[in-house]
Amino acid sequence: MFQVVSKTDWLTVRAYFALLKPRVVSLVTFTAVTGAVLAYFSGYHAPFFSVFTAIFCIAVGSGAAGALNMYYDRDIDAIMSRTSKRPIPQGKISPEAALVFGLVLFALSVLLMELAVNHLSAVLLSVAVFYYSVIYTVYLKRRTPQNIVVGGGAGAFPPMIGWAAVANHIGVESLVLFLIIFLWTPPHFWALALKNSGEYEAAGIPMLPVTSGVKATKMQILCYSVLLFITSILPYLLRFSGGTYMIVAFILGLVFLYYAINVYLDEKKCMKLFYYSVLYLFLLFGVFILDAALSTALGMLI
């Protein structure tokens, strides 16, 4: 007989799903796919099943990191209105259950990556999850205003892992993708921190606007935005992307600088930069895939 799933069961499933930080997972997964596709169009090949498994493992590993982060940050999540609706502060999931859930997903994702893909990808995935869950969440976030800068490396690993899943090595191309996300992270999160500086201060988190003030934060946002703009052109200069990427990256970068300058002039416009930065990363990495596909297609025709 079929058993009807109760409303309580569905709410529990939704709560566990929320622990994974699905919006973050979607962006992480997309950047990982970009790394894998770029490796493929660069002449490296791997079985489709292993590549698909790698992307799945990266998504699960990212979700595990999100769950472990929510476990450790449950005290400050309850203080901040932006995070107070998360499953643990709401009492939908116990801290112990969240911890076990995160650790199990972490172990399974790394083990499957090791068995079905390759050792390098498994090592990189384990480092990325550890970096975010322990180095950033436990040691950096509550201790230094540079938490986002140093901790930003965790979110920059996925395209490198995607590349390694196909190529089985770390190429210059994947390092540039890593650097793009690394430099994207500070202006993205500091824009949000400008909006919620009062809540961060109340929670005891030394975000840059809290420790150094609004003016210094706006200057840092602008500086990192300039560095991001320059770095986004590197793929074309290093000849692993073509003219299509160059044109789109240049335009996207100019718009990013426009929003960053607006924030520098008026911090109240910080959320426009925050929302655009998410769109920026999706479009930039999307055009990586498009450009690589177009270049390969043209090469076959010539």
Swiss-Prot record:
UniProt enzyme class: transferase
Enzyme Commission numbers on file: 2.5.1.141
Keywords: Cell inner membrane, Cell membrane, Heme biosynthesis, Membrane, Transferase, Transmembrane, Transmembrane helix
Gene3D superfamilies: UbiA prenyltransferase
InterPro entries xrefs: Protohaem_IX_farnesylTrfase, UbiA_prenyltransferase, UbiA_prenylTrfase_CS, UbiA_sf
Reaction(s) catalysed (UniProt annotation): heme b + (2E,6E)-farnesyl diphosphate + H2O = Fe(II)-heme o + diphosphate
Domain of life: Bacteria
Transmembrane stretches, start-end: 24-44, 48-68, 97-117, 120-140, 147-167, 174-194, 221-241, 245-265, 282-302
Pfam families: UbiA (PF01040)
GO CC terms: plasma membrane
One BP term from GO: heme O biosynthetic process
Membrane topology according to the record: Multi-pass membrane protein
A GO molecular function held by the record: protoheme IX farnesyltransferase activity
Note: Carbon 2 of the heme B porphyrin ring is defined according to the Fischer nomenclature.
Similarity comment: Belongs to the UbiA prenyltransferase family. Protoheme IX farnesyltransferase subfamily.
Protein name: Protoheme IX farnesyltransferase
Protein's organism: Neorickettsia sennetsu (strain ATCC VR-367 / Miyayama)
